[in-house]
């Protein structure tokens, strides 16, 4: 290597190496301080684009999980109301059956009739006032009575679940409004008509049971949907993490290595900067 006063090649090489090492040290320290391997598009342009797409998918699926849970809660509210209606209907069936027994006096039948009518009124009360989040569910024009309720259960617009229990709910409401129910069980004729309307095929007990079965089937489906969404969120998040997250073991090693190289480079630079003075010594 020539000994020159004007160009200190060794110093230039050392400076360039120091600049490169400084950049690597800064990158390692930035990754350690933020916890991310990719802090700007320049770190990994393709990786950042993929990670952004995975993040959007993950967020969409997380919202879909909440939607599914809300759907389950909404249907559980309606099904719970129907469960109580079933219990009430069983009691009404018992009263109608008991009223037909010849051992009852007129006062006995009147007492049974009064209870029967109160229970019938409570059935209508449940139908009219069961609500979720301020929305009536079983009343005329209510959520499930009006038609299909659509739940968004995926990250794309095509991933939906339509729950349509309107026909069976309307049938229950029509049965409750039937004279066989509203007239009570004050005499044997009325009691027989009520008993038939409650317990026969296509009667109130069967209609309520069919409605509950619809809700139950869709609740079970949504629970499986949530499990699958949770699995997808877990794996999509892991994939995004492999792209975006810093490996602390690797970055700590890089930081230590580059700190040592910076120290060594600084020492070497001070030595190379002394080379031009060596040329002056030749003139003494």
From Swiss-Prot:
SUPFAM superfamilies: Phase 1 flagellin (SSF64518). GO terms for molecular function: structural molecule activity. InterPro entries: Flagellin (IPR001492), Flagellin_C (IPR046358), Flagellin_C_sub2 (IPR042187), Flagellin_N (IPR001029), lat_flg_LafA (IPR054892). It is found in: Secreted; Bacterial flagellum. The keyword Secreted applies. Keywords: Bacterial flagellum, Secreted. It holds the Pfam family Flagellin_C. The keyword Secreted applies. One of its GO terms (cellular component) is bacterial-type flagellum. Belongs to the bacterial flagellin family. Flagellin is the subunit protein which polymerizes to form the filaments of bacterial flagella. Essential for lateral flagellar synthesis and swarming motility. NCBIfam families: lat_flg_LafA_2 (NF038071). Homomer. V.parahaemolyticus possesses two flagellar systems: a single polar flagellum propels the bacterium in liquid (swimming), while multiple lateral (peritrichous) flagella move the bacterium over surfaces (swarming). The polar flagellum is synthesized constitutively but lateral flagella are produced only under conditions in which the polar flagellum is not functional. The peritrichous flagella are unsheathed and powered by the proton motive force. This is Lateral flagellin. It comes from Vibrio parahaemolyticus serotype O3:K6 (strain RIMD 2210633).
